[in-house]
Amino acid sequence: MTKTALLKLFVAIVITFILILPEYFKTPKERTLELSCLEVCLQSNFTYSLSSLNFSFVTFLQPVRETQIIMRIFLNPSNFRNFTRTCQDITGEFKMCSSCLVCESKGNMDFISQEQTSKVLIRRGSMEVKANDFHSPCQHFNFSVAPLVDHLEEYNTTCHLKNHTGRSTIMEDEPSKEKSINYTCRIMEYPNDCIHISLHLEMDIKNITCSMKITWYILVLLVFIFLIILTIRKILEGQRRVQKWQSHRDKPTSVLLRGSDSEKLRALNVQVLSAETTQRLPLDQVQEVLPPIPEL
């Protein structure tokens, strides 16, 4: 391959690398995921623990609708094994969902990444509630969870369940609570011993720079260093060519002629010298040298 073809290939590789590179540096911005918990069914004889509740919850990153995520929180760890059968019956009778909370997101569902929308993430956390303040199912929760995602991607996820206890039979009759819907827990009591709660969940997701992105940073640095070295080399080669051409131009002719050429140079010098001497002779001497012309 010629130098021109190699240069074109190198330029094409660099352009492709620059175009693909931003895809590897896309990091999910710190955002807030709003989950509106639609309803929770609690039996009248359900009792909470005194000091704290250890719970596990499963998030299905599977679009039920375009902008919806179903999130199921199990306050009772014993129900965790039967979460599929339990939450499948939530649209029907509420026999098996005494501690099942169903939430859906208001915003975009790709709050972690689009590639993980079909995976099931199991998250575990802890929730501490004082016994004397636990007068209703709605409390102020602050807990941290760690999703099980790909090993190349690491996330710190902090969930804040911000709500306020409120009881009403008709939610639309309270305009003051409509303004503070982000921090309001709406409770509606029904005759079938079920309580429907509407919550607001704020989830801040922060991305940590992983080894993959560090590798790409190093590759970018190496490419730039290579380009700088190549440019400096081309500049130095051009300067060397100019200096070499000037040195060849300034060399005397006698240095370039060798062997038989030196003899020709000496003969040439002798002829030039004799011509110069004859030109410098006076006119009388020139006449003496010339022979007389015979008369006809």
From Swiss-Prot:
The keyword Glycoprotein applies. Keywords: Glycoprotein, Membrane, Transmembrane, Transmembrane helix. The keyword Transmembrane helix applies. It is found in: Membrane. The chain crosses the membrane at residues 5-25, 212-232. Residues 1-4, 233-296 are cytoplasmic. It comes from the Eukaryota. It is a multi-pass membrane protein. Its main location: membrane. Glycans are attached at N45, N156. InterPro entries: TMEM156. One of its GO terms (cellular component) is membrane. Residues 26-211 are extracellular. This is Transmembrane protein 156. The gene is TMEM156.
